[in-house]
Amino acid sequence: MNTYVADYSALLHRANEAVTAALGPTPDGVEVAEALRTSDSLAGRIDHTLLKADATRSAIETLCGEAIEHKFASVCVNTRWVPTAAERLAGSGVMVCTVVGFPLGAMTRLAKAEEARIAVAEGADEVDMVLDIGGLLSSDLAAVYDDILGVVGAARPAPVKVILETSMLNDDQKAIACLIAARTGAAYVKTSTGFGGGGANAHDIALMRAMVGEALGVKASGAVRSREDARAMLKAGADRIGASSSVAIVSGDEAAAGGY
C-alpha cells in the first residue's frame, strides 16, 4: 500500500472536492511534460541556483563552471542570465533552468507566459514559475489554473515546475495547488522561492508527493544547505533539489547561513 496515500487520504479527498467544484471533473488525456529526472547521484538531482538581484555576469559564469565540474542537473538563474548560461553550458550536459513570475507570483497571466516563451527561445531547458499565490489564498482556483496553464503552454517543450511558496499556505491549500498543477500538464511541483520567509521541509515534501503520486516530480528548494538536508528531502519524496549551497552539499562542507 502507498503509505503517502494512506496518511493523506482525507486531505486528498478534501482537495479533490475543492478543485472539482471550481474546475469541474479532471479532464482526460492531460499531456504532462516529461519531468527531466536526471541521474541517481546526489549532484545529478541538484539545480545549482543563483537568483539574487546582485548576481553579476562573472558570478553566473562561475556558477556554470561549478555545475559542469560537479555534474549538477542544471543551473537555475533569472531570465536576464539565460543567454549567458546557455552559451556557457552548451554541450556540457548541464541544463539551464530559469524562473518566471519570480519571486512574488503576482504578475499577470499574460506577462508570465511571455516571460516563459522568451526564456525558452533564449535557451532555457526548464522553467520554474511562481503560481498566483494571492489567487490561491482568495480561493480563485480558476485564476490559479489559468495562470499555470498559460506558462505550461508558452514554455513547451520545456517542462514547468510550479512553485507553491509553501510557507504561505496551509496544508489544504498546498494540496489544492498540487492538484491544480497536475491538471495543467506541469512536470513538477516545487516548495519555495527561497525569498518568501520559509523553505523546504520533510512534511511538505511528503504531502506534495502524496498529492501528485508518481505522475509529477517534486522539487525541494529553500533552506537546503547541507548533505543531510538534501538527503532528508530525497527520503521524504523529492527528486530534485534547488540550492545555492550545492558545492557544500556534495562535498559535505558546512554552507554559509542565508543561502537559497
Locate predicted features:
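Alpha/beta enzyme core
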Residues: 32-70, 80-102, 108-218, 226-249, ...
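Compositionally biased, intrinsically disordered low-complexity segments
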Residues: 22, 250-253
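Charged, compositionally biased N-terminal leader segments and the immediate start
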Residues: 1-46
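Short, hydrophobic beta-strand segments that form beta-sheet elements in well-ordered domains
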Residues: 75-77
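Short hydrophobic "strand-cap" motifs at the C-terminus of beta-strands
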Residues: 221
